[in-house]
């Protein structure tokens, strides 16, 4: 389960790294939490971004975030509205906004990617993430990190 590894924390550092990781959070699952943990290791600031659909309850998302991630300094959650059921556009706009607000900081886009046992399953499983990466690639020079999670058999 996602809770098994404990909460996500930024390590204490003497000198800032100069990196902010923006982590796409499609759900509070093991791949997403592994992505947050990776981002915390390589960044001074971590921003988890959840683009919510109409069915998602923001209060429940925040409650689960609090339980799994906690109130760690330097790790934030942003819940974005999804007009017209688009998950890609709000995330791309958020990334562009952060880059514009903080041009002196390197921004790394961290995306969880589930790796299924059978390769043909990956065509459907990660389609949203692939579309997200393509949209972000099209609009500028960005650093991407894919955090892979191999699904059990």
Annotate each language-model stretch with its function.
Residues 1-153:
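Cytosolic C-terminal regulatory domains/tails of membrane transporters and channels
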């Amino acid at each position: 389960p996602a809770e098994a590894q404990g909460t996500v924390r930024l390590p204490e550092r003497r000198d800032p790294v100069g990196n902010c990781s923006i982590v796409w959070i499609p759900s509070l699952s093991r791949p997403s939490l592994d992505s947050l943990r990776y981002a915390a290791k390589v960044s001074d600031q971590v921003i988890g971004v959840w683009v919510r659909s109409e069915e998602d309850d923001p209060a429940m998302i925040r409650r689960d975030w609090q339980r799994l991630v906690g109130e760690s300094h330097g790790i934030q959650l942003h819940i974005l509205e999804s007009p017209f059921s688009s998950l890609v556009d709000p995330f791309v706009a958020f990334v562009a906004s952060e880059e514009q607000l903080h041009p002196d900081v390197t921004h790394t886009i961290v995306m969880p990617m589930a790796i299924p046992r059978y390769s043909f399953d990956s065509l459907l499983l990660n389609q949203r993430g692939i579309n997200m990466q393509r949209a972000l690639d099209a609009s500028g020079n960005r650093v991407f990190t894919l955090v892979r999670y191999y699904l059990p058999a």
